[in-house]
């Protein structure tokens, strides 16, 4: 099926979503499964960059949600001391052997979790972390320990997601567009970027920076206040601004533009990606 045909089938299925069950067969099941497979392989993305803008394939996001209706809950094995889990989404690595790992070309440290329909590109390093459905993690990126990449999130090339970083998903609460971290960004430990916000190329977020759609992003040099997007090449730290009643409220502060000193402190280590 072409992508245009898949889109039409998914949109029709979405309108009739209450009728979809694990017993559903035919074009509806085939379209949902084909879309999830394309997302899993990286040939389709929930969002793709066109020039300077990001285009969201809303139908692909709908397919991720519809996938939940196609399977019943089941026991999933592999836990410590023969423990199990209870879920309806397969691991991306289910049934993988040496050949599949070599073909995929990324490293997955024990106890990392990647759910089916997420794409992991070559050269990625996954420490014990979590990558949810429909996400896209591009080449050379490090997803460090306890970092989470939310549903349908888009992570660019050569990004470093430090320990405990949270990149928000789109499924609950429902978001119009995915959270996006563009190429060559460094996201400091325990930072959170959520609600479909965009961190533009080459930016650095310091430790403990939290950005949602309502977070004020303040340029210290110009005083400009923006929302939802960090400009390319920004260095951002946590800060505060005066509010009513003499109370200061949290904000994110652009303290400078990325320079050689910043790059030397946040460069990726190629030795880890061999």
Curated annotation (Swiss-Prot):
Pfam families in the cross-refs: Hexapep_2, THDPS_N_2
Keyword Glycosyltransferase recorded: no
What superkingdom does the record give?
A: Bacteria
Can you say where in the cell this protein is located?
Answer: Cytoplasm
The record's family statement is: Belongs to the transferase hexapeptide repeat family.
Description of how the protein assembles with itself and partners:
Homotrimer.
Specify the protein name: 2,3,4,5-tetrahydropyridine-2,6-dicarboxylate N-succinyltransferase
Q: What is the lineage of its organism?
A: Bacteria, Pseudomonadati, Pseudomonadota, Alphaproteobacteria, Rhodobacterales
């Amino acid at each position: 099926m072409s992508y245009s045909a898949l889109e039409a089938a998914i949109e029709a299925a979405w309108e009739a979503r209450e009728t979809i069950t694990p017993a559903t067969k035919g074009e509806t099941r085939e379209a949902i499964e084909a879309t999830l497979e394309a997302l899993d392989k990286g040939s389709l993305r929930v969002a793709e960059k066109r020039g300077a803008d990001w285009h969201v394939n809303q139908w692909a996001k709908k397919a991720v949600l519809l996938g939940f209706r196609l399977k019943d809950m089941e026991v999933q094995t592999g836990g410590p001391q023969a423990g199990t889990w209870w879920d309806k989404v397969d691991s991306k690595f289910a049934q993988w052997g040496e050949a599949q790992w070599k073909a995929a070309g990324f490293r997955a440290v024990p106890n990392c979790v990647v759910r089916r329909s997420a794409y992991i590109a070559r050269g990625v390093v996954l420490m014990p972390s979590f990558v949810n459905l429909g996400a896209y993690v591009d080449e050379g990126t490090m997803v460090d320990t306890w970092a989470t990449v939310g549903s349908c999130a888009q992570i660019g090339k050569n990004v470093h997601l430090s320990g405990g970083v949270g990149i928000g998903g789109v499924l609950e609460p429902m978001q119009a567009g995915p959270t996006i971290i563009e190429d060559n960004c460094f996201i400091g430990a325990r930072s959170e970027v959520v609600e479909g916000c965009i961190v533009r190329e080459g930016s650095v977020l310091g430790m403990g920076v939290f950005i949602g759609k309502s977070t004020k992003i303040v340029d210290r040099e110009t005083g400009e206040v923006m929302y939802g997007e960090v400009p390319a090449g920004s260095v951002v730290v946590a800060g505060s601004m005066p509010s009513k009643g003499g109370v200061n409220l949290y904000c994110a502060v652009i303290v400078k533009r990325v320079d050689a000193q910043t790059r030397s402190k946040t460069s990726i280590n190629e030795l880890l990606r061999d």
